[in-house]
Amino acid sequence: MADLEEQLSDEEKVRIAAKFIIHAPPGEFNEVFNDVRLLLNNDNLLREGAAHAFAQYNLDQFTPVKIEGYEDQVLITEHGDLGNGKFLDPKNRICFKFDHLRKEATDPRPYEAENAIESWRTSIETALRAYVKEHYPNGVCTVYGKKIDGQQTIIACIESHQFQAKNFWNGRWRSEWKFTISPSATQVVGILKIQVHYYEDGNVQLVSHKDIQDSLTVSNEVQTAKEFIKIVEAAENEYQTAISENYQTMSDTTFKALRRQLPVTRTKIDWNKILSYKIGKEMQNA
């Protein structure tokens, strides 16, 4: 191990550490960070060299954050990244600084975003918040209105998680939906992601995603929002149902095939008669 450490440059050590951090399971960032910190044994090198990994993890995971003085949480995503460690809260029309390591929001200030699309953004957000409240008990959503390549674009992000460290599992749901405001009809593009880590009697991760495309009729803001939510609800329900059915199938077939039904002797041990077996006598005499 000592020879290996001597062969690795600081740059290589940081690259490896950053990869561990970026791939940390949901809810386990601190545990992975602390382990990497012990392995690297150089706090300054870790903080400076792997800072991009801290940021990338939060952006990829749609990390929710509470801003002091405001009721609703906001998601940390690439769509709200204003640069220099600042992020947008479109609902409250503020920007704030975000510490990617501590996961804390500070210094909220007024911020004016795209006013031309604000009425559309607000309508979509109102409908999406109602949907998230109904379907995701711990869900958070953030809706952005941006001009991309000259087109007014809505981007809706949803995050919901369950962290059950005491029960040895953690999981997170993420979905992202995007469409442009155009006459008559437009195309909705979505991506749904599930990541679950179970580690009580083993180390198993589920990492799954699905891409969605559908057409959306564009009329007024309120009606368009209703039609958009119908698409979101149908796609997310179908995906979650498919995941559940696949797991049931694997439980009934694949997982059972991994475990031998009988010992190599092809006979089961009668635990009530264990003392009459030679091994039982040996255990008694031990």
From Swiss-Prot:
Please give the InterPro entries that the UniProt record associates with this protein. Answer: CapZ_alpha, CapZ_alpha/beta, CapZ_alpha/beta_2, CapZ_alpha_1, F-actin_cap_asu_CS
Q: Please name the GO terms of the biological process aspect recorded for this protein, alphabetically.
A: actin cytoskeleton organization; barbed-end actin filament capping
Sorted alphabetically, which keywords does the UniProt record give? Acetylation, Actin capping, Actin-binding, Phosphoprotein
* Domain of life of the source: Eukaryota
What cellular component terms from Gene Ontology apply here? cortical cytoskeleton; F-actin capping protein complex
Which of the residues bear the PTM N-acetylalanine?
A2
What would be an example GO MF term here? actin filament binding
Where are residues bearing Phosphoserine located in the sequence? S9
| Quaternary structure, from the entry | Component of the F-actin capping complex, composed of a heterodimer of an alpha and a beta subunit. Component of the WASH complex, composed of F-actin-capping protein subunit alpha (CAPZA1, CAPZA2 or CAPZA3), F-actin-capping protein subunit beta (CAPZB), WASHC1, WASHC2, WASHC3, WASHC4 and WASHC5. Interacts with RCSD1/CAPZIP. Directly interacts with CRACD; this interaction decreases binding to actin.
The protein's role, per its UniProt record: F-actin-capping proteins bind in a Ca(2+)-independent manner to the fast growing ends of actin filaments (barbed end) thereby blocking the exchange of subunits at these ends. Unlike other capping proteins (such as gelsolin and severin), these proteins do not sever actin filaments.
Its family? Belongs to the F-actin-capping protein alpha subunit family.
| Designated name of the protein | F-actin-capping protein subunit alpha-2
Q: Which organism is it from?
A: Dasypus novemcinctus (Nine-banded armadillo)
